[in-house]
Amino acid sequence: MPKNSKVVKRELDDDVTESVKDLLSNEDSADDAFKTSELIVDGQEEKDTDVEEGSEVEDERPAWSSKLQYILAQVGFSVGLGNVWRFPYLCQKNGGGAYLLPYLILLMVIGIPLFFLELSVGQRIRRGSIGVWNYISPKLGGIGFASCVVCYFVALYYNVIIGWSLFYFSQSFQQPLPWDQCPLVKNASHTFVEPECEQSSATTYYWYREALNISSSISESGGLNWKMTICLLAAWVMVCLAMIKGIQSSGKIIYFSSLFPYVVLICFLIRALLLNGSIDGIRHMFTPKLEIMLEPKVWREAATQVFFALGLGFGGVIAFSSYNKRDNNCHFDAVLVSFINFFTSVLATLVVFAVLGFKANVINEKCITQNSQTIMKFLKMGNISQDIIPHHINLSAVTAEDYHLVYDIIQKVKEEEFPALHLNSCKIEEELNKAVQGTGLAFIAFTEAMTHFPASPFWSVMFFLMLVNLGLGSMFGTIEGIVTPIVDTFKVRKEILTVICCLLAFCIGLIFVQRSGNYFVTMFDDYSATLPLLIVVILENIAVCFVYGIDKFMEDLKDMLGFAPSRYYYYMWKYVSPLMLLSLLIASVVNMGLSPPGYNAWIEDKASEEFLSYPTWGLVVCVSLVVFAVLPVPVVFIVRRFNLIDDSSGNLASVTYKRGRVLNEPVNLEGDDTSLIHGKISSEMPSPNFGKNIYRKQSGSPTLDTAPNGRYGIGYLMADIMPDMPESDL
C-alpha cells in the first residue's frame, strides 16, 4: 500500500476490523462482505468483487453477443465432415437402422454427460482448457496442454481437407464437370482414352491424378502439388481472418457457416428424392440387420463416433463455453447440441443414401443394358437356346425385373457353363453394399452421382461449398481450443498468436500437399487423435469426479444453474462413464494392435488401391504422434509435483482461481501492511502477486516470514488464523 494511504487506513481500522471478524467467523457472510465492501485506495473508491462475479480479468473477457450465436458455434464445431461422410458409412456397415439404437444409447450414456461436463467447467471457471484443469489441480494442468497439442495435430490435416474442397469448388463452375469423362490422349498415330482412367473411372482418375497427382507410396514425396498448396494457403487465410479477433470476428461468420450446410442438405434431400432409385437407397439404408447389432465391434464403433462427433477432449467445447455468463443453462445447451448433432447425422445419411441409391440405379441400368447385349450375342451364336427365354421378354428394352428372371433361368440351365459366360446379376443391393466413406465418398462416389444430376455444376458448387462450411465450423472450434487456453495462460495478444499459429500450421501442413500428402493425412487421422483424446477425456472425468470431488461439483452446478441437476449425471460421471471410457480405450488399443499399421496406396500401373505397410520411419512417426500428444500430462505432473521449475511467475498457469480476488497489480508492502488479507489461496499454489483491491485487518497477524512451509502468500496467513475453514466452491 502506498505511504500516502496510511492515514486513511488508520481512520478506517475499526470498521475494517469488524468486517474482518465477520469474514473469519462465517464463510458465507464473508463472501457477501467481500463482494460488497468498498475501500479507499489512493483517494479513489473501489469495489471488491468475487472472481466468479466479475474480477478485472472476467470483465475484460469477451462474451457471446447472443445465445443463438453461442449455440450455432457449438453446433458448427461438433457438426463436421464426419457427420456427412463417416456416420452414413458406419450406419450402413453396422446394421443399417439397427445401428441407431446403440448409437442413441451411447449418446445418452457417454456423449451428453461428458459434453455437459465440459460445458459446465468451461462456463464455471471461464478459462480455456489449460486454465480449467489448473483450477481443478495444478498437477493435472497437463490435460489442457495435451488438448492443445491434439487440436494442433488435427488442425494441420483437417484444413487440408478444406483445401481439397476449395479446389473442387473452384473446378465446379464449368459444363460439363471436369470429372465427367475420361480424358483423351493423343499420339502421332491415333487418339485413345487415358489407360489409368479407363481401368478405373472418370471421378476416381480425376481425384487421384488431376487433383492429388498422387505418388505410389508414402516414401515417394514427389514434390509439392502447387494447386493444392494454393488451396491450403487460401484455407488458412480464411481461418486466420475469421479467428483473428476471437469470437468477436468468428461469431459473425458462424451464422452462415453453421446454417448454410442445413440449407444444402435439405435441398439435396428434396432433389434426390425426385430421382429414380433414391427410395431404394434409403430403404436399403434403414433396413435393420438385428443380428449385426449384437456384435461388440458395432458398439465400439458407435462409442467412438459419439465421442468424436461431439468434439470431446479437444478443448473447443470448453473454450466456447468459457465466454458464457455464469448462470447460463449449460445443461439445456448440452442436450440441445447433442441431439442437433444426432439429427444432422441422420439427415446427412438420408441425403447420402438417396444420392447413392440414384447412382446405384444408373449403374445398374448400364449393367443390365450391357449384359442384355451379351446375352443377345450368345443367342445369335447358339451358346444359349432361344427356347429358354420367355416370349414376353424383349432383351432390346428389358426391365430390371425381366433381366433378373432371364439371368436366373440361364444360371439354372447352364449351371456348369455359367461362370464362363461372365454375366453379372446387376442387383442394386450389391452396388449399395459397396461401403464408401471419407474422401472416397465425398470426392469419388458423390461427385460421380452429381454428374448424372440435371444442372450438375450447380449441385457440385453447393455440395463443396457445404463441405467448406462444415470444415470451417469445426476449424473455428479447433483453433479456439488452441488459442484461448494459451491467451488465458500466457497473456499474449490473441491477434498475434492467431496469426503465428496459422502461419506455422501452413508451413508444417506443406507435408500434406506433397504428391504423397494424402498418405500423411491418413496417418495423422489414424494416430494423432484417437488414443490421445480418449486418454484426455478419461483424465478429465477423473479430475472432476475424484480430484475436485463429484459432490462438490454437483453443488457448483446447483449454484450455477439455479436447480439441482439430475442424479443421473452423478452416477454417469462417477461410475458408468469412466468404466465405459476405459473399456473403449482398451478396445481401441487392441484393435490398433491387431490391425497392421498401413495405408491404401494408389498404384498407377494397376489403376487401383493397394494396402501397403508403413516403412520404419513411418512407424516412428505414428508412435511419436501418440506420445507427443499425451506427453504434457506426465511432464506437467512431474514438474509440479517435485517443483522442478520456479512457477511463481504464472508462466505455467500456476494460479488457480479459488473464491476471492485474483490480484494482478503488485504493490509495495510496508510495516504492518503485511497484515493485509487477500482471500483464500490454495496451499499448493506458488505465491501470487498482490493487487490493490484487498482486505485489511489489524496488525498482529502472522508476518510474511512465518507463512507455512516457508511460503509467503497471504492466503496461508488466513489458513493459520482459521485452519478449519472449508474449501470454497469451484
Curated annotation (Swiss-Prot):
It catalyses: L-leucine(in) + Na(+)(in) = L-leucine(out) + Na(+)(out); L-isoleucine(in) + Na(+)(in) = L-isoleucine(out) + Na(+)(out); L-methionine(in) + Na(+)(in) = L-methionine(out) + Na(+)(out); L-proline(in) + Na(+)(in) = L-proline(out) + Na(+)(out). Residues 170-223, 356-458 are cytoplasmic. The keyword Cell division does not apply. Residues 1-70, 640-730 are extracellular. Glycans are attached at N276. Keywords: Amino-acid transport, Glycoprotein, Ion transport, Membrane, Neurotransmitter transport, Phosphoprotein, Sodium, Sodium transport, Symport, Transmembrane, Transmembrane helix, Transport. InterPro entries: B(0)AT2, Na/ntran_symport, Neutral_aa_SLC6, SNS_sf. GO terms for cellular component: membrane; plasma membrane. The modification Phosphoserine is found at S25, S55, S687, S699, S701. GO terms for biological process: L-leucine transport; neurotransmitter transport; neutral amino acid transport; proline transport. The chain crosses the membrane at residues 71-91, 97-117, 149-169, 224-244, 253-273, 302-322, 335-355, 459-479, 494-514, 530-550, 575-595, 619-639. It is found in: Membrane. Belongs to the sodium:neurotransmitter symporter (SNF) (TC 2.A.22) family. SLC6A15 subfamily. Functions as a sodium-dependent neutral amino acid transporter. Exhibits preference for the branched-chain amino acids, particularly leucine, valine and isoleucine and methionine. Can also transport low-affinity substrates such as alanine, phenylalanine, glutamine and pipecolic acid. Mediates the saturable, pH-sensitive and electrogenic cotransport of proline and sodium ions with a stoichiometry of 1:1. May have a role as transporter for neurotransmitter precursors into neurons. In contrast to other members of the neurotransmitter transporter family, does not appear to be chloride-dependent. PANTHER family: SODIUM-DEPENDENT NEUTRAL AMINO ACID TRANSPORTER B(0)AT2, SODIUM/CHLORIDE DEPENDENT TRANSPORTER. This is Sodium-dependent neutral amino acid transporter B(0)AT2. It comes from Pongo abelii. The gene is SLC6A15.
